[in-house]
Amino acid sequence: MKKNIALVMGGYSGEHDISIASGNQVYNQLDHSKYNVYKIVIDREGWYWERNGEHLPVDRSDFTVNDNGRKVCFDLAFIMVHGNPGENGVLQGYFDMLGIRYTTSGYYTSALTFQKGYCNPVVKSFGLVKVAKSVLLYKEPPTEAKLDELMEGMRYPVFVKPAAGGSSVATTKVKCREQLLSAIREAFTEDRQVLVEEFIPGREFDCGVMQFPRGSKYEGWNPDFKHKLVFPVTEIIPIGGHEFFDYEAKYDGFSNEVCPAEVDDSIAHHIQEVSYRLYDLLGCRGIVRFDYIYNTEEQELYFLEVNTIPGQSAESIVPKQARALGISPAELYEMSIQAALAQ
C-alpha cells in the first residue's frame, strides 16, 4: 500500500518563498508511484493542502486532510519549512505529540541549533572547532551610550544578525561604530534576540551530512564515517561586490559555489570529520548542513552555524554536493524518507 507523505513547506518567516521553492523541488523528485504526496503549505493565513490550485483545509487537531470524503492520515511528514516553525522545533514537537514521523532532527536539536546564541557555546564546549566572540542581545536595541560596553573585547568588523533565523535575512556586516545601532535595529525587526559576532576573515566552506537507512548501498562507503553520508565540501565565493554570503548572494546568483572545494585534502577531510562528529554530538537527524570559515592566517576552522533544513532547490548547496557523489535528488530524498520511516 502506498504511504501518505505530507510535504510541509512555507512558514512564517522571511524564508517562506525559499521554502516553497525547496518544497516544489522535492515534490517533483519524489516517486509518486510509491507515495501519495500531499503539499501542505503553512503561512500566516493558515495551513492548507494545495491541490491543483485549490487551498483545502488541514485539521490541525490531528494533522489530517479530507480527500473527497476520505480522511487522510499521514505516515510521514517531509518537513521543508525553513525558519519558523520548521527549523526551530515547533513542528517537530507537534508531530511528536501526534506520533507522526518526520525527516528532520528532533524538537530539542532543532530548537538549540536554530538559536545561534545558544548553539555557539555548546559547539565551543565540544572542543572540535573554534567559535567567534559574540554578544547576545535581548528584546530591544541598546542605547547609544551602551555601544562601547557591548563591543568590549571585540573588534570591528562584526556581523549583526537575528539570533534565530536563516538565509542571512536582516544580517549586516558592520565596519564601524556609526553603523552598529542601525544594524542592530534592523535585526530586531526579525527576532527578539540579536547576535553581534566578531568577523572572522577567511574562506567559507559548507558540508552536508545525512544518515542513511540500514542496508543502504552506501554502508561502508567510507570507513571514517560510519552509518552516514558526509558530502564533499563546498567553497562559497561571493562575487559582484558582495562581501559575504548574504541573501542576494545565496539566491540571486552573486556567488560561485565550488564543489568539491579546491582546497588541501587535509583541510577538506578535517571539515568533513568535524561535521560528522557535530552531527552526532548535537543529536541531528535527516539532511543537515554545517557552515564554517577557515582562517588561512591562523590555519584554524571556525564554526558559523548549523542548518537542520537546508535548501533543496535545484541550485542549493546540498543537492550539488550529492550530485558530486553521483547521487540524484530523487535518490537523496528517497534515502531521507526511508531513514525517517526506520526511526
Where are these regions (language model features)?
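ATP-binding N-terminal substructure of ATP-dependent carboxylate-amine bond-forming enzymes
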Residues: 1-108, 112-118, 122-125, 138-149
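Active-site nucleotide/adenylate-binding loops and adjacent lid/helix of ATP-dependent enzymes
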Residues: 2-9, 13, 71, 112-203, ...
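Hydrophobic beta-strand scaffold residues
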Residues: 37, 101-102, 130-131, 158, ...
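Glycine-rich phosphate/pyrophosphate-binding beta-alpha loops
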Residues: 83, 168, 307-321
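Phosphate-binding site of ATP-dependent enzymes
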Residues: 172-273, 300-302
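Conserved metal-phosphate-binding beta-hairpin within the catalytic cores
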Residues: 198, 279-312, 322
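Peripheral (often C-terminal) accessory segments that flank ATP-dependent C-N-forming ligase machineries
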Residues: 257, 261-262, 266-269, 273, ...
